[in-house]
């Protein structure tokens, strides 16, 4: 299975790549949690001076939350919706409060949660 989010240190930057190009890099719960965790680690690491996020593929930065998944599995599992949105909003809040510059390389389709990944950064 391919990693849905890639993390790489390049020089003094943490590079985050959303890696679901077939799904237009739509966010799922695991992605929101892993980005939030990586952001916390980067903000407490003095070697990291800024964070860069981009989307894999050539069609989208991020099409937002994975509404196909939420629609398919969320009907029988309300907690799936609640947990996803709770943790996605926590991630957005962490981005907004980050003490280090956050750069979103927006190229292609960007909607909903993709906008959240880009506009909240300092």
Region annotations inferred by a language model:
Residues 54-55, 106:
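Short beta-strand/turn micro-motifs composed of small residues
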Residues 1-54, 79, 93:
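Conserved CoA-thioester-binding segment of acyl-CoA-metabolizing enzymes
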Residues 31, 66-69, 117-120:
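Short, glycine/charged-enriched secondary-structure capping and boundary segments
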Residues 38, 87-98:
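Catalytic-core regions built around general acid/base machinery
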Residues 95-122:
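Glycine-rich beta-to-alpha active-site loop
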Residues 26, 75, 79, 106-109:
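Alpha-helix capping and helix-loop boundary segments enriched in small/acidic/polar residues
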Residues 55-90:
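Glycine- (often His-adjacent) and acidic-residue-rich active-site loop
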Residues 23-24, 58-59, 110:
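Glycine-/small-residue-rich active-site loops that bind phosphorylated ligands and cofactors
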């Amino acid at each position: 299975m391919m990693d849905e989010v890639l993390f790489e240190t390049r020089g003094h930057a943490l590079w985050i790549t959303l890696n679901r190009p077939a799904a237009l890099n739509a966010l799922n719960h695991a992605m929101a949690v892993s980005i939030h965790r990586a952001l916390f680690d980067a903000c407490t690491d003095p070697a990291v001076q800024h964070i860069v996020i981009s989307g894999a593929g050539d069609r989208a930065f991020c099409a937002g939350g994975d509404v196909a998944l939420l629609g398919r599995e969320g009907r029988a599992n309300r907690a799936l919706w609640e947990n996803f949105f709770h943790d996605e909003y926590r991630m957005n809040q962490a981005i907004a409060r980050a003490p280090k510059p956050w750069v979103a390389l927006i190229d292609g389709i960007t909607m909903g949660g993709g906008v959240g990944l880009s506009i909240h950064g300092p």
